[in-house]
Amino acid sequence: MARRKLRVRQHTPVREVECPATAHDGDEVRFRTHLATGGVVESRNLVAAVGGYAKPRVPALASDVDPVVAQLHSRDYRNPESLPDGAVLVVGAGISGQQIADELAERGRRVFLSVGRHRTYPRHYRGRTIHEWMYVFSLYDDFVTPDPRHLGEDRRRLPGLPVTAVKDGAGELNLGTLAEKGVTLVGSTRAARGHVLELADNVEEIARDAARSLREVLDTIDTGLRRRGFVAPEQHPAPTVRTDHITDFGPTLDLARHHIGTIIWCTGFGPDYAILPGRALDEHGVPIQQKGILGSIPGLYYAGLPDGNSLAPAAISANVENGRFIARQIHIDHIMRSGSSASLMV
């Protein structure tokens, strides 16, 4: 950004984007962006790079947990020393959940990890990062599309990020390595009754599914390399998730009995489009758009907008083409309005 001399305002949240219904396509100013600091930025075009991971998600059952137990979202977690004494329950086995559970265990805390369905990918494989392989072999699109019959909340649900957790940027981190460190794996949290949580008895099943997802992505990469004649160093041993020492926990977890004083909700984030003009959103509060890029209002573009069946919007590396498309559209708008003879082909 410094090289291109972009005017960047750091630590400046946007309070609201205003686009009056009377705004005309020919207006020089179509958007007024109100900043939390009190300033206003006027523009003809607007790129809303709000993404889909803006607002912490905490399940409703959290309100049914005994109030003596401290609760926080992973966004607010800082370090083990900042937590009350006692054992800790981490809910959610995504990247944050596994890394937090690992750090707590390393610091000598008794840790329980309530698992959920996820895919486990290695951070690196055969000389490349997993994100490079996902880009080369189009793995960003290999995710399930929400059932279109269930709108509303399902439309806001993002495709799950594969777990590529590592410890200190080096060793792989997964359910197998956590269990080996003494982290107690418990089933998915389903309900709460005071100090007792109701669980799905599914630890072994989820661990097997995670191990299978790892084998499948490695096989996809290996097969793709062979078919396309690409050269990449072999990796031995290949990454794996050990499940032989993982067992089901049972249908309930008594927080008091296990001296659990803190629950950390590593249950992800959801989108928050409240700053955008109301007429840019549908009845569910979701942007009206085309292909996750073109907004319903002329001059409004989106970057990183979740499209429901792909991880591409969640990865900066996969948004390069979207960024180029948006830049071309704004360039064309500028050239055609200025009467310049500059080329439109950029």
Regions found by a protein language model. Name each.
Residues 1-346:
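Flavin (primarily FAD) cofactor-binding/catalytic cores of flavoenzymes
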